[in-house]
C-alpha cells in the first residue's frame, strides 16, 4: 500500500463549493489506473499551509465569481509559477468567456483553463489533457489567436483597464490620463471588441488579470530565474 501511495501524484484542488469538489473527485476516480491523489481545500490559506508538508504535481484553482477572490487566486498562481515552476497550474472558470480571458491574458502560462459551462465529457477530457501536458491542436490555435489579440492592446487601453480594476469611473480615468471622455469611451469599446467581451463585467475580468500581469512582470525582475 505504501508503494502504491508513493506512485500517485499529488494534486491540490482549491474549491469553496463542497458539491463541486465532490463532482471533481468523482472525475478523478474515472481516470485509468487513478494515478492521482486529490487533496481538496476550501481556502488558499489551508492550501498554502499544506504546501509545507506536501509536494504537489499540479494545483487546480476553481475561481469564484467574486472579483476579490479571483484576484487572490491569480496572485497565488503567479507566485506558484515563480516559486514552483515545475508544478502544473490549472484554472476552472465560471463560464466560457472567463475561461477565454484567463487563457489569453494570464500573467503566466497555464497548463489548462477549464470552464464549468463545458459538458461533463469535455470537462473530463480537458482535465486529463491538462494534467498530462497534452494540448489539442484546435485549442492551441484558438488560444494563440486570443493571445495575439491581447497583444494588440495599446498602452492607453491597458492603462484604462488597470484604472477600471481599481474602481475608477470613465470620467475619473479621463481626468487621470488627461483625455476627453469621448476618447476614453472610444478606447473602452475598442478593447471590448479586441477581447470579445460585451459587458463591463467582462472588462473587469480582463482588468484584474492585467493588474496581476504587472505584478508578475515586477516579480520576475526582482526574482529572476
UniProtKB/Swiss-Prot annotation:
GO terms for molecular function: DNA binding; DNA-binding transcription factor activity. GO terms for cellular component: transcription regulator complex. It comes from the Bacteria. Residues 170-189 bind DNA. It holds the Pfam family GerE. Keywords: Activator, DNA-binding, Transcription, Transcription regulation. The lineage of its organism: Bacteria, Pseudomonadati, Pseudomonadota, Gammaproteobacteria, Enterobacterales. Induction: Repressed by H-NS, activated by LeuO. Member of the yjjQ-bglJ operon. This is Transcriptional activator protein BglJ. Gene3D superfamilies: Winged helix-like DNA-binding domain superfamily/Winged helix DNA-binding domain (1.10.10.10). Forms a complex with RcsB; genetically both BglJ and RcsB are required to relieve bgl operon repression by H-NS and by StpA. A crytic transcriptional activator. When its expression is induced it relieves H-NS repression of the bgl operon. Acts independently of transcription factor LeuO. GO terms for biological process: positive regulation of DNA-templated transcription; regulation of carbohydrate catabolic process; response to radiation. Residues 146-211 form the HTH luxR-type domain. InterPro entries: Sig_transdc_resp-reg_C-effctor (IPR016032), Tscrpt_reg_LuxR_C (IPR000792), WalR-like (IPR039420), WH-like_DNA-bd_sf (IPR036388).
Amino acid at each position: 500500500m505504501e508503494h502504491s501511495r508513493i506512485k500517485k501524484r499529488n494534486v491540490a484542488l482549491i474549491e469553496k463549493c463542497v458539491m463541486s469538489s465532490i463532482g471533481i473527485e468523482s472525475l478523478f476516480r474515472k481516470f485509468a489506473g487513478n494515478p492521482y491523489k486529490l487533496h481538496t481545500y476550501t481556502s488558499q490559506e489551508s492550501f498554502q499551509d499544506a504546501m509545507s508538508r506536501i509536494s504537489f504535481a499540479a494545483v487546480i484553482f476553481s475561481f469564484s465569481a467574486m472579483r476579490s477572490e479571483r484576484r487572490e487566486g491569480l496572485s497565488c498562481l503567479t507566485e506558484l509559477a515563480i516559486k514552483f515552476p515545475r508544478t502544473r497550474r490549472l484554472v476552472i472558470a465560471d463560464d466560457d468567456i472567463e475561461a477565454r480571458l484567463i487563457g489569453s491574458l494570464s500573467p503566466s502560462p497555464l497548463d489548462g483553463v477549464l470552464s464549468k459551462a463545458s459538458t461533463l465529457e469535455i470537462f473530463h477530457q480537458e482535465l486529463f489533457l491538462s494534467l498530462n501536458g497534452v494540448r489539442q491542436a484546435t485549442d492551441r490555435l484558438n488560444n494563440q489567436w486570443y493571445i495575439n489579440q491581447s497583444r494588440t492592446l495599446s498602452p492607453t487601453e491597458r492603462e484604462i483597464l488597470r484604472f477600471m480594476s481599481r474602481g475608477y469611473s470613465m470620467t475619473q480615468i479621463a481626468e487621470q490620463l488627461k483625455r476627453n471622455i469621448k476618447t476614453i469611451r472610444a478606447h473602452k469599446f475598442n478593447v471590448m471588441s479586441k477581447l470579445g467581451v460585451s459587458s463591463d463585467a467582462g472588462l473587469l475580468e480582463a482588468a484584474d488579470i492585467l493588474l496581476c500581469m504587472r505584478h508578475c512582470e515586477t516579480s520576475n525582475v526582482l526574482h529572476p530565474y
